[in-house]
């Protein structure tokens, strides 16, 4: 026996008013269906079947996974018809879990409880109680037992008053589900083959039906339009913010924090407002992230601070470093311990050594900077000739004066001093002072031009 997961992703999503298939619309910068696929893997899916229809080429382009079995639903004739397309791919003794590509917030823990609630010869449903159940299929019970589901358009007044609703998520035995699906008809207001009709069949066959509720109703929220998509995004971010705060992080305003990847935190991490986390980010102990900063695929060491409005991507920042405000660190940047990078500094494929400082208005690209180096304001490494990139090497204890250009390839020896306003085109030896600026001239009795009226 194995667990087969069938993910329904064939809908066009007309109300999105988009050429993009609905399940490819992003939540936290990732397609909704990708969230569902990842959750299915976490609960131990041995076979993953993705039922697709509209936008097949785009789906296969965006969702590239070797463990997916792509199942075509050529005509969208309802959820029951969609699941039935996967019948040839599961065995009678398998368990079949049905999920939906537009409900990205469902949690692995909820699905584990659902799987555990299913009797060996039974079925388990995920249901939720809503204050406003309009639009959802109602759970019909008799003497406390689930006996069926009635869709909104087919419900009578008594059934419309029911607040327990169907989420569509269920798990059943493969053989039983095969039998029930084969008996579906489309004699209903929508003219579709409803997956929900198998519940009444299961009851008629004396199949035990368990019902499980998610911890939070937001787990089963879907998106049919862009308003609901935005609501999903906020619900997702609320879940992530709460998880981080429970783990010990301080979020100055949880409602103004976006996690669009994964974040690993140490102790006493403080994150100010409007911070965006993308990719895989690791923050050490006692790290502070300033307002409006964007972090992507980076590691920040203990007791380091990123000041407001800094953008850090693909960088490694050691312990006790200071970055920003208004700093951009691009891929390949490494800051060693106690390094400081200040406002309006950009670094790319550059290393700043232990205790070195680069405080203002500087570009360091393709550069190796040693320990205890001072980089003056306005320094530029000229690393590109229009075709090729070249490296600048600055050894330990160098002092670089303001407004200096280093034309790569060039090496500055240990302890050298570069005078402000210099353009360095040749290597500099250890402990040398180099000044290349034009000598200052004094012109007496100079009269500035006067505009003619």
Curated annotation (Swiss-Prot):
The GO terms this record gives for MF are: glucosamine-1-phosphate N-acetyltransferase activity; magnesium ion binding; UDP-N-acetylglucosamine diphosphorylase activity
The record's keywords, sorted A to Z, are: Acyltransferase, Cell shape, Cell wall biogenesis/degradation, Cytoplasm, Magnesium, Metal-binding, Multifunctional enzyme, Nucleotidyltransferase, Peptidoglycan synthesis, Repeat, Transferase
Region N-acetyltransferase: start and end of each range?
248-453
Entry's Pfam families? Hexapep (PF00132), NTP_transf_3 (PF12804)
The pathway entry for this protein reads as: Nucleotide-sugar biosynthesis; UDP-N-acetyl-alpha-D-glucosamine biosynthesis; N-acetyl-alpha-D-glucosamine 1-phosphate from alpha-D-glucosamine 6-phosphate (route II): step 2/2; Nucleotide-sugar biosynthesis; UDP-N-acetyl-alpha-D-glucosamine biosynthesis; UDP-N-acetyl-alpha-D-glucosamine from N-acetyl-alpha-D-glucosamine 1-phosphate: step 1/1; Bacterial outer membrane biogenesis; LPS lipid A biosynthesis
SUPFAM superfamilies named among the record's database cross-references: Nucleotide-diphospho-sugar transferases, Trimeric LpxA-like enzymes
**Positions contributing to UDP-N-acetyl-alpha-D-glucosamine binding:** 8-11, 22, 73, 78-79, 100-102, 137, 151, 166, 224, 330, 348, 363, 374
Major localisation: cytoplasm
- Residues reported in the UniProt entry to bind acetyl-CoA: 377, 383-384, 402, 420, 437
Cellular component terms (Gene Ontology): cytoplasm; membrane
Which Gene Ontology biological process is one annotated for this entry?
A: cell morphogenesis
As to how many cofactors bind and how, the note says: Binds 1 Mg(2+) ion per subunit.
Please list the residues that bind Mg(2+).
102, 224
Keyword Magnesium in annotation: yes
- UniProt-annotated location(s): Cytoplasm
Requisite cofactors: Mg(2+)
Any idea of its EC number?
Answer: 2.7.7.23, 2.3.1.157
Q: What family does the database annotate?
A: In the N-terminal section; belongs to the N-acetylglucosamine-1-phosphate uridyltransferase family.
Record text on subunit structure and interactions: Homotrimer.
Q: What does the function comment of this entry state?
A: Catalyzes the last two sequential reactions in the de novo biosynthetic pathway for UDP-N-acetylglucosamine (UDP-GlcNAc). The C-terminal domain catalyzes the transfer of acetyl group from acetyl coenzyme A to glucosamine-1-phosphate (GlcN-1-P) to produce N-acetylglucosamine-1-phosphate (GlcNAc-1-P), which is converted into UDP-GlcNAc by the transfer of uridine 5-monophosphate (from uridine 5-triphosphate), a reaction catalyzed by the N-terminal domain.
Q: What is this protein called?
A: Bifunctional protein GlmU
Species per Swiss-Prot/TrEMBL record: Aeromonas hydrophila subsp. hydrophila (strain ATCC 7966 / DSM 30187 / BCRC 13018 / CCUG 14551 / JCM 1027 / KCTC 2358 / NCIMB 9240 / NCTC 8049)
């Amino acid at each position: 026996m194995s667990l087969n997961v069938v993910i329904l992703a064939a809908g066009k999503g007309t109300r999105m008013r988009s050429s993009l298939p609905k399940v490819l619309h992003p939540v936290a910068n990732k397609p909704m269906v990708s969230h569902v696929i990842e959750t299915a893997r976490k609960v131990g899916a041995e076979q993953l079947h993705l039922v697709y229809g509209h936008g097949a080429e785009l789906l296969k382009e965006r969702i590239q996974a070797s463990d997916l079995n792509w199942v075509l639903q050529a005509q969208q004739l309802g959820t029951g018809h969609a699941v039935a397309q996967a019948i040839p791919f599961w065995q009678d003794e398998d368990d079949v879990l049905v999920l939906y590509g537009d409900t990205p917030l469902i949690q692995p823990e909820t699905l584990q409880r659902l799987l555990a609630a299913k009797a060996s010869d039974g079925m388990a449903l995920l249901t939720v109680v809503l204050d406003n159940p309009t639009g959802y299929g109602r759970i019909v019970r008799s003497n406390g037992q689930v006996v069926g589901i009635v869709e909104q358009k087919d419900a009578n007044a008594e059934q419309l008053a029911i607040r327990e609703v169907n989420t569509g998520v269920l798990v059943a035995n493969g053989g039983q589900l095969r039998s029930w699906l084969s008996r579906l008809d489309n004699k209903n207001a929508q003219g579709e083959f409803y997956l929900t009709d198998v519940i009444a069949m299961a009851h008629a066959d004396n199949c035990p039906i368990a019902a499980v509720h998610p911890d939070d109703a937001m787990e089963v929220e879907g998106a049919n339009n862009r308003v609901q998509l935005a609501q999903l995004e906020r619900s997702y971010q609320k879940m992530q913010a709460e998880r981080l705060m429970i783990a010990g992080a301080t979020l100055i305003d949880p409602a103004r924090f976006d996690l669009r990847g994964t974040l690993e935190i140490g102790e006493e991490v403080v994150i100010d407002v409007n911070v965006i986390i993308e990719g895989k980010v690791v923050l050490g102990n006692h790290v502070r992230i300033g307002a409006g900063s964007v972090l992507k695929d980076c590691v920040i060491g203990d007791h380091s601070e990123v000041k407001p409005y800094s953008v850090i991507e693909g960088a490694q920042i050691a312990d006790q470093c200071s970055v920003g405000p208004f700093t951009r660190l691009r891929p390949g940047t490494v800051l060693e311990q106690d390094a400081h990078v200040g406002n309006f500094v950009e670094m790319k494929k550059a290393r700043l050594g232990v205790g070195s400082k680069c405080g203002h208005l500087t570009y360091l690209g393709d550069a190796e900077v040693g320990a205890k180096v001072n980089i003056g304001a306005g320094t530029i490494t000229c690393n590109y000739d229009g075709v090729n990139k070249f490296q600048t090497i600055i050894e330990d204890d160098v002092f670089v004066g303001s407004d200096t250009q280093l034309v790569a390839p060039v090496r500055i020896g240990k302890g050298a001093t570069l005078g402000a306003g210099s353009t360095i085109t040749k290597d500099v030896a250890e402990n040398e002072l180099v000044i290349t600026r034009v000598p200052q001239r004094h012109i007496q009795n100079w009269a500035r031009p006067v505009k003619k009226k």
